[in-house]
């Protein structure tokens, strides 16, 4: 409580407020562009495939060429905010939210493990917000709800595995 709400200067408290600040632009842009970008571009396979390939190449280059200077606990507000802002690009079909945030973190010199940890923490508020926003559209779709729950559980295992893998 003291670390988070009272903003005591601990790494956990600081990172909590960084996550809050980094979530706002992605959420706002996503809310504003939801009907325009997703509906229009979502039906264009060439856009989706191109975005996926381009972002994959950019992530590969960023991971190989960027220095790994910054650890999780040393990330700055600027780094965390720009990583959060980059989430907005995920509204382009074919652009992975995790991929674009990992790319941004690596381009800013954050090491792999720290970028992955921050990316996964950052996913919680944005995914939860998007789920609540779209809740009315799928609340009575039982197969969809089962799929979401299964994806969540699987995702937790994958995140744990990936974080362990990135430590190596």
What label would you give each PLM region?
Residues 1-96, 100-168:
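Multi-pass membrane proteins that catalyze or facilitate reactions on polyprenyl-/lipid-phosphate substrates
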